[in-house]
Amino acid sequence: MRNKFSQISLFDIYSDVSSAINNREPSFLDLLDEHLDLSSLIPVEFYRAFYKYTGRKRVYSLESFIRFFLLQKFIGIDKDSAMLITLSVCQELRDFCGFTKLPDAAKITRFKQDFCDHLENFFNRLVDITEPICRALDEKKADYLIFDTTGLEIPVAENNPKFFNIKLKHAKAIHKKNPNFDPYLGVYSLLPDTAEKCDRAKHQYINGHYCYAVKAAVVTNGLGIVRHIQLFDDEFKKTHPEVVEAKSDNPDVDKEIGDSTALKPVLSDFFKVHPELSYKTFIGDSSFDSFDIYSALRYDFHFERACVPINPRNSKQKQTDENSAQQKPLPVNFDKNGIPLCPLDNTPFISLGKSKGAHRSTRFKFVCPKSKPGGKSRICTCETPCTDSSYGRCVYIYPDKDFRMYPGILRGTEHWD
């Protein structure tokens, strides 16, 4: 019978390890050395800021720090201290980074804090450099611009499930004294607005769960390559005061910064940094289903197409059944100037001008020609009304929906003439 086991000797182990050390080829590092020319990628302003006169010579080069961070992301090590331990036991990685001696973790942290803005400019420069490469890979997909928001969860105690369980116990204690208090809904109001150790980590509802995170916008192309990341921090809110925060006691409706509210400021900053970039197709979710956003995408950011699903909440349709006595309103036609006509005798509707409520798109309001002012409202005097409303039939026209027919001014009106 064949022996399935073999005797392992210390000599064989030593021989195998020695052979592996002598024969291994770090091909990945060789590829990086061959194709990664950091001197041509790092902006000149970054060099000047790093090597400016400080009273003593730099022990570590700028390229060494950049290589350290790139290698850290390639390997997938989150903590700087763990990455330094890895370098301490691997000569090849130290040689790749160019460290004659290893810096401590505090030195790495100070570098990121002191040169945060320059690191951002470095990545912005990479976007400009990689854009032609993306176009060469797939011209069609590289011409897509995809926008979405996310939350970067911070490793704070408030994100630990134990923290929530403690607050839930407090809520249940309140429920014992007040039976009308719902502990599972009320616990949300007991949670602090920000994390104790990091005020940038705010309590918000993201991706179906609550957490303490820094909300951010991510812009990618159709290839999935990131083009821009914008944190919704205090600096961003100060630059764009139109971004309003909201905080409620209900996690189902709480939104720190809405997706549609953040779209215009983020895209404005993106194209300001990259004025030579242009895209024809915008892709986003149904939260961008707004006529104001369609107008901004087309005329401010010069998109030719906007792929945004219709939001059912923005499309109110009157539902009837066979047993309902309510009839479906007759369709309304329009004249050559875009004025709606009465479905019974083609009489032009009466224009009441522009109508724009809070957080609503600009629209033109038309009312039934037989609707008369009566006190605080209007009263329909039609003998055969086409609606059950005592106000009379109303038609709203969104100019951005058909910019050719409604170019900001109603055709055929006194203002047009």
Each language-model region and where it sits:
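Major-groove recognition helix of helix-turn-helix-like DNA-binding domains
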Residues: 97-116
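An anionic, glycine-rich sequence signature occurring as long contiguous blocks
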Residues: 2-4, 300, 307-309, 317-417
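Residues within the helices of the helix-turn-helix
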Residues: 81, 85, 106, 280
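Polybasic low-complexity intrinsically disordered regions
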Residues: 114-286, 291-299, 311
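Basic, short loop/linker segments at the boundary and entry of helix-turn-helix/winged-helix-like folds
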Residues: 28-75
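Charged, often Cys/His-bearing segments associated with DNA-binding zinc-finger transcription factors
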Residues: 1-46, 388
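Short coil turns linking two alpha-helices in DNA-binding domains
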Residues: 79, 104-108, 122
